Amino acid sequence: LFIDTANKDNMTPQLGDFEATNPCGEQWLLPYESCNLGSINLANFAIKGKVDYERLKEIVRTATVFLDNVIDCNRFPIPEIKEMTLKTRKIGMGIMGLHDLLIQLKIPYGSDQGRDVASKVMKFIRDAAEERSIELAKEKGPFPAYDSTLNTYQPRRNAALTSIQPTGTVSMIADCASGCEPYFSIVMVKHVMDGDRLIMVNRYFEQVARKEGFYSAELMS
């Protein structure tokens, strides 16, 4: 992470420079800022070998409203965090299941085509979130720190919109690849606190194994 580069793109320079990130490093923050995060599971947006952009836009727009509402429903640990969070109203909409999407599209992760799809999908998410945030600014007002004399971008509800989180735990619950990362193993073993071992099998591999007739419990363990 390069803090000087990040500060060049600071959306609210009138409030000061970035000094930190949130715990996983995906969102730059001013002193006392916080950010509400959420992840869209891209595994659910493949249809007939293509990305279902119509449904994806609907979900992004809904998620933008939900994440913005969380700010107002939140309980903040100290007054300074509440004050800064309400000033900038940052949200961080991310993804998980990118590799799942590419598998369903039959596109290798890391290929030129795979990178093109990832870029197109994230730009689409970013644009749809910005569009909805601009609409929310017209309905409820822009984030309070917005200054039309300093900020050249169109008024919007949230100073930040997208952020790619690792989703290491929630992706396990959703049974998809974490964040924008590839699957690093076909079969994984998760050791839980009570000493149990959970065997986690890649569902796409299991489907192929069953279809081609080489599936067995021994293979999966």
Predicted segments, located by residue:
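Long, C-terminal-biased catalytic regions of enzyme "large/alpha" subunits
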Residues: 1-221
